[in-house]
Amino acid sequence: MRRYLSKILLWSWIVTLPISIIGGYLLYQMIDRTYTYNVRYGGAKEELQLDNIARYEIAQLVNYTRAHITKFLKNQETTLRPIHLIVPEANLATLQAHMPQSGFSYVKGRMLHQGKLKKVKVKYRGDTFYRWAWDKKSIRIKTAKQSLYEGIRSVNLLAPRTEEQLNNYLSYRLAKIMGVLAPRTELVRLYLNGEDQGVHTLVEQIKEITLRNASLMPGDIYRGEIIGKDRFGPGAPTDSLFRSAAVWDKVAVNNHFAESSNAPLQLLISLVQQSHLSEAQKQLSQIMDMKAWGAFSAFESLTQSAHTDEIHNWRIYFDPWRNQFVPIVWDSMGWHGNMRGAKLKNEVIANSLMRTLFQNGDFIRARSEALRSFFATGKDQAFLGIVSKAIDAMEHEVDTDPYLKPAKPDFVKSKIRRLEEVIQGVLAGIDGGFLENHSKPDSVIASARFDQQSLDLVIRGKHPVNTLRLNLSETVKTLPQAQVFYQSPTGEERVSLPVAASNTGASLVIQGGFLPNLTVEVGERFRGTLQSTPGVYRIAIEGLDPNTKI
């Protein structure tokens, strides 16, 4: 017995030494990460508490080992475009020296592109801990001016920040389909000094070159951010981007004016603050590209994104040729709330600017047309095809992603599939849909009472009635005029509308864009809810033969 015990004690180090090494490594990682991001950085987030970091480190080590074994046994290669970065270890140490502050300064590196190693600068990217507190970090690459990466100089390689992984990637793809200005995006596999870093989302950093690639005139791109370190910039502290132009800066500059020039933005903010005035709304119709803003709002509804809010994620281009503002999609995090139980909203009103626009008839018409066109032209089905393809690709990739977060491939796959179901549900129009013709079949959108050569028209719902067709008792040879009367906050308004004949003069067609009475109920944190009451119009047809009736 003593002999056996001696042998066990003699060889016990074979078991205890690896356990001690692994235990020591995990303990060091836990203490270091907790001290860096919870104690020194002061994140005060539940995820950065010691017990949660301990669970993360253990799960990450298990997943790292499993991913490499899976890749070796199955000989599984990535189906995504590989991005190879080479950064000297000394430069990586500089980035890591005093996180997170040290990570925000560029270090030199190289990038393999088209078979050549090209000089680049590399840093970590993001204002909040989920971008760089974990092993899979978000990175920004900046190329030389003479050596762009496929027409882009600043490239973000973003670590997915949610269990479902694909929120921003699919949001940007949807924006492109809808014709909304957005950065280029792609799913890629990142390799750093030859080591696999897993799946990242490539997102173009919005700069002047974004405009050039979209065939737009170079001009100012205003950036609205008062979150993270941007809370301490000029004009701060404040809880709204729409109180002062001082809290905005530019990521692209019209070189015909000083960089500090922001007169168009000042005008926009003043109009937002006076949005209850009809004159302010008229000016907004002039300085806002309403087709683009209507499409942007439709995009927010289809992604259920309230991430462009009162304090961050604003990118607005001012077109110097047309003197109009155009929205740019940025970090929208589509379907994030729906994945966590939020109910579908037909309208997303998450800030003062959108609250202002929802009081503008031209905007309402443009938004409705964007939604109608999206479904009528089959873009919804085209997008669902993109969703399915992206999810198939991710299911192939996560098994070998060494830094997958959360570090549970089967769990991530289930969440990705759930995201597909959520997107399908939103596009199918849960709870009534986006357009009235997707709603209850017995709902009455418009009704009219006729009186000889005039009518009283009532419009319900939240979308315009664009066309009226009036059948006549007699054919007309000379086109009459339509005079429309309605009540506004300042009193009765009168508008003349053009009239066209159809059916060889037996019918009249009026293109009016008649709206219900829409108001925005202001809620918490500058958000709003669209309320609808019937819109009432009196339409008089002038110039008809006295014997002709509607």
Regions found by a protein language model. Name each.
Residues R2-K116, Q381-I550:
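Regulatory N- and C-terminal appendages and interdomain linkers associated
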Residues E259-Q266, S270-D309, I316, N323-H463:
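Middle-to-C-terminal accessory/interaction subdomains
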Residues Q96-H98, K123, I152, H200, ...:
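Short, solvent-exposed loop/turn and secondary-structure capping segments
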Residues R140-K142, N156-L158, R189, G198-L202, ...:
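Structural recognition of the beta-strand scaffold that forms the well-ordered cores
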Residues S154, V180-Y191, A280-L284, W314, ...:
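Surface-exposed patches in mature extracellular/periplasmic domains of secreted proteins
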Residues V180-P183, E195-A295, I391-M394:
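Internal "kinase-insert"/substrate-recognition segments embedded within catalytic cores
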Residues P160-E195:
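A conserved helix-loop-beta module that forms one wall/lid of the active-site cleft
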Residues G103-R161:
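Conserved oxyanion/phosphate-binding beta-strand-loop segments in alpha/beta enzyme cores
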